[in-house]
C-alpha cells in the first residue's frame, strides 16, 4: 500500500510537471529520482533511522571545486543492474495503466512511454495506441525523442516477460546493443584524449588532473598520473626527467648501503629483516606476480629500506600489502597489454626492474607520509580512525551500531585491519587500484579522511545482513566479506556513497556531534 501511495504521488507530480510546471526543471524524472535517493544500495529499508535532508548542492550538476561531479551517477541509475533500486512493483505499474486508461492525454501518454526505462518498467507491454519512443544515442542520457522513427521501435534489448507472468526487475542483458558499445568506446577514447591533453602540457594542471582522475584513470595513463598525484613528479615538464633520474639514483644508493656491506647489521635491523622475510611470501599468495622470487626480493628491499629510513615506525605488518598496487601499476608501463598479475617479471631487463622498484619505493613513501601515525608505536592513528568510524556509523545507521553493541561486537575487532591495510584484504587488487585512483585524486587526505567514509559506506552496505546475525556470525562475516564478484561498478558506487557522507559530515567533526 505504501509503494502504491508513493507511486500515485509520483504520478501527480509528473502530471503537474507535464501540464504546466515542466519549465521548472529540464528533466522532471530527476525530481522524482531525488526523492528516492535515500534508498542507497545495501541499506535496509526497514531502518528506523531518519534520513538526513541533503542540500541541493550535493545533487547539482555542477561539481564541487575539488571533486568530479557525482550527482548524475548518484541520483539516477546508470545501468540496468542499478535501475532495480528505483523500479516500482509490477502491481503499481499495472494500476498505473488502469488509472490512466483512455482518458490520459496524448502528451502525457507519450511522456510515460518515454520514461518507462528510467523507472525500470520497460518490460511491461505498452498499449498499441501509444507509440514507442526512440532512445538517445548516449547510453546514460535520460532524454528520448518524442516521435517514433518511421513507426519502428528503435529500443533494443527489451526483456521478455518471465514465464510465471511476473515482471522481473531489470538484469544485466546478455546482448548489448551496438549503439551502446560504440557510445561507450567513443566515451573512453574521449576520456583518454582529455588525460593526454593535460599530461602533454608544458606544466601539468594538477587540479584539472585530480578532477578528471576522480572517476578513474585509463590504464595506459595510470602510472604517470599516480606519480603526479602523489607529488613524486614535478608538474614542470622541463624538470621531470632530471627529477626522476635523481630520485631513482637516490633509492639505488640507499639500497646499496643497506645490502652491499661487509659489516653485520645491528640486532634491531635483523629483527625487522626477519619479519619482512616472513611477511613477503604471504602477500597476495594467489597472484603469480607476487610469488615470483624476483618480485619477492624487490618487495623485501623496498620494505627494508623504508623501515631503515623511518626508525620512528619501522616495519609494521600490513605495509607489505600497500606496496603491491604500485609494483603492478608501474610494471604495466613496460609490458603493454599483457596482464601484470600473470607476467613473468624476469622477462624485463634489470634496468627496467630497478626503475619499477625505485618508483614503487618513493610512491609508497609519499602515501605513508600522510598516514604515518598508523604505524608508529601503539598505532594511535588507527585507533583514532576506528573511533571515528564508530561515531560516523552511529550517525548514518544507528540501528546497526546498536545491534553490534548488543551482540558485544567492538569496532576494533573488525575495522583495525580495514585501517591498517586500507581494505586490501577485503577487496581484489584490481578494485583497490581503481579505488586508489579516487584516493589520490582526493589529495593528501585521501588515504586517511576519505578512507574513513569509504569504510563507513562499506560497513553500512551490509547492514541488513549484519542485523540478522549473532556475535560469532558477525565476526566471521566481517572477516570474509563476500566481495569476490565485485566489479569496478561496485567500487564506483561505494565511492559515490562515501562522497555523499563526506559532503554531509566532513569539517568541524560534525559526524561526532549528537
Swiss-Prot record:
SMART domains attached to this UniProt entry: TBC
Sequence ranges assigned to domain Rab-GAP TBC in this UniProt record: 216-443
UniProtKB keywords: Cytoplasm, Golgi apparatus, GTPase activation, Nucleus
Swiss-Prot/TrEMBL GO biological process terms: vesicle-mediated transport
GO cellular component: cytoplasm; cytosol; Golgi apparatus; Golgi stack; nucleus
Region of interest (Disordered), ranges: 17-65, 130-164
Predominant cellular place of this UniProt entry's protein: Golgi
One GO MF term attached to the UniProt entry: GTPase activator activity
Ranges annotated as biased composition (Polar residues): 18-28, 135-158
Pfam families reported for this sequence: RabGAP-TBC (PF00566)
Family annotation (InterPro entries): Rab-GAP-TBC_dom, Rab-GAP_TBC_sf
Subcellular localization, as worded in the UniProt entry: Golgi apparatus, Golgi stack; Cytoplasm; Nucleus
Function: Stimulates specifically the GTPase activity of ypt1. Functions on the Golgi as a negative regulator of ypt1.
Protein name according to UniProt: GTPase-activating protein gyp1
Organism: Schizosaccharomyces pombe (strain 972 / ATCC 24843)
Gene, per the UniProt record: gyp1
